[in-house]
Amino acid sequence: MNFIHDYRSPRVIFGPDSLARLPQELERLGIDRALVLTTPEQAPLGRQVAEPVIGHVAAFYDGATMHVPALVAEEACKIARTSEANGVIAIGGGSTIGLAKIVALRTELPIVAVPTTYAGSEMTSIFGITEGGVKKTGRDARVMPRAVIYEPRLTLELPLSISVTSAINAIAHAVEGLYAPDATPLLTIMAQEGIAATVRAISRMYQSPRDLQARGDALYGAWLCASVVGNVSMALHHKLCHTLGGTLDLPHAQTHTVVLPHALAYNARAVPDAMRVLRIALGHDDPPTALYELARDNGAPVALRDLGMREEDIEHVGDLALQDRYPNPRELDRDALLALLRDAYHGRPPSA
C-alpha cells in the first residue's frame, strides 16, 4: 500500500441550531463588513440568515446564478470592493458558493459558507467560471471557505425535485473519489459512509420531505462526499458534466444525476476495488444500475433530452470532452464516449 494523505478542509459547524454560531465565526475571522451573496430566489432567506449579524453586513448581492457567468462574477467583485467588504457570507447552493469562490480568488476575502443544498462546493478548493460558452475550472486554496455552517433546517424548504438531484450530485463526488489516482484509505472510508448515508436520506426525504433527521443525514452525507472530491483529482464524470453545463447551460445537479450511472458504467471494469466499495455502500450488485434506479424511483431525471439537450449536440459535447486529456481509469475512446452520451441523452439504462 502506497499513498500520500494531505487532507484540506474548512472548519465545520454541523447540526440543528448551528446557525447560532454565525456571529462567533465572523468574529473569529475578523469579519465586520460582510458581503452577503445569494441567488435571486434565496434573497429573502439570505436576509433572514444575516439578520442576527446585520450590523456587520456591508452589502447584499443576490445575482448568483448557475455556472458563475463571468459578468456576474465581475459585478459581485465590484460590489465587494466598493462596499469595502472584508469577508463574504455565501448562503445557498453551488451557484452562490461558486460565486463566492471567484470573489475570494480575486479579492482574497475569507468566506463563511451556509449551504442550503447538498452540492458540496463549500468543502473544496475547486472553482469554476463560464465565459463565451466555456466553463473553466481550477483549484486554489484561497477559494476554500474558512468556515462552513451546516444547518439542516435551512434545507427543509428545498423543493423535493432539487433535493434528490442535489443529493445524487453529492454521491457523484464520492464515486469519482473512489477511483482517483490520489485516493487514500481514509478518503475511501469517507466515500463509502457518505454514499450510504446519502442514499438512505434520499428515500426518506422522498417519502417525507420535511423529515429533519433525513435532511440532516443528507447534509452529513454531502459533507463527507464533498470532502472526498475536494482532496482528489476528478475524472470522466465531472469532465462531462462541466462540459454539458458550460456549453449547453444544462442545470448542474440534474446533469450530474443523469450522467453518473453512465460514467460509472464506462469505467466499471477498470476499477474493481471501487466497485466492491460501491456494492456495499449502495446495497446492490450492479452499482451503475443502482444509481440509475435511485434517480428514476425518486422522481429525478434520467435523460439529458429532458434537461434541454438536443441530439445534434452529442458529437460536439463528446469532442469537447476529449480536447483536454485528464486522468481516467479507462482510456477515453470517442466512439465509446458518444455511445455513453447517446444512452444518457435517451435515458436508457447504463451499459458498459
From Swiss-Prot:
Pathway per its UniProt entry is: Aromatic compound metabolism; 3-chlorocatechol degradation
InterPro entries given in the database record: ADH_Fe/GldA, ADH_Fe_C, Alcohol_dehydrogenase_Fe, MAR
- What reaction gets catalysed by this protein? 3-oxoadipate + NAD(+) = maleylacetate + NADH + H(+); 3-oxoadipate + NADP(+) = maleylacetate + NADPH + H(+)
| Classification via Pfam families | ADH_Fe_C (PF25137), Fe-ADH (PF00465)
According to its UniProt record, the EC number is: 1.3.1.32
Q: Which UniProt keywords apply?
A: Aromatic hydrocarbons catabolism, NAD, Oxidoreductase
Q: Which CDD domains match?
A: MAR (cd08177)
User: Which principal EC class is assigned to this enzyme?
Assistant: oxidoreductase
Gene Ontology terms: biological process: catabolic process
Q: Which GO terms describe its molecular function?
A: alcohol dehydrogenase (NAD+) activity; maleylacetate reductase activity; metal ion binding
Q: Which family does it belong to?
A: Belongs to the iron-containing alcohol dehydrogenase family.
Protein name, as recorded: Maleylacetate reductase
What lineage is on file?
Answer: Bacteria, Pseudomonadati, Pseudomonadota, Gammaproteobacteria, Pseudomonadales
